[in-house]
């Protein structure tokens, strides 16, 4: 299992919640109306609840000017300004069947699965109809070894990275409305930035304001231009870098540090932040917030 599924500690979030420079955006456009109310649980200081719809999911999540939770094609991620890439919180897993047995077989096919770390699925209460929740736990001799280790120190992750230990929580959910796949949910050790009881499988259209899209197109950076035109579109967007300088750094490497508006090919992970009303961005129809630079002119970003 990939290392981006690490336990999430949200202590000190408010320290990092400073407004990004140059963001003239108003409040993000609302998602489609639903009959559900925002969670009763109070958001963290500096955050507010909003509805997220995309990637076959809809749920309530907290967002601030610096940190937010977004849907994507694989599930959901947390993004933070000045981080090079998103941190995964939820992941769809194709099972090729139904029920917990199919889920175990699907996990055994995942990269990094170690058959020596024997595991079993334990059903728990999902707290809502049409949803089954399962927790992956160590089994057999592996369980005995883990139990001995857990008596001495915290072990947050077991079972090849998919199971629980004695610190934090993670589980799988099966939806009646989404047969043939399961959703892995990473809770961590503290109350998450999303409301786990609101997670629903859906066929609704992705909300471009709350869904991280991967777009290919043409990027230009100059003295008065930061633009991106997606393939197959005639719309030129202003781009705002949220990757801690990765976008401009990679552009500079290709142009020798000359920001002269040269067109380069790029693949970016972005959300649509709507129209801004100040600066050069105001001349564009909308603004794309860049949360990851996948590649520029065929050169892929180094994993960090």
Where are these regions (language model features)?
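OB-fold/S1-family single-stranded nucleic acid-binding modules
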Residues: 275-304
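Flexible glycine-rich surface loops and low-complexity tracts that mediate binding to linear polymers
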Residues: 255-278
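Positively charged n-region of N-terminal signal peptides that target proteins for export
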Residues: 1-4
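C-terminal motif of bacterial Sec signal peptides marking the signal peptidase cleavage site
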Residues: 13-16
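OB-fold (S1/OB) nucleic-acid-binding surfaces
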Residues: 226-245
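Structural detector for short beta-strands of small beta-barrel domains
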Residues: 211-226, 268-270
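N-terminal targeting sequences that direct proteins away from the cytosol to non-cytosolic compartments
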Residues: 18-85, 163-169, 175-210
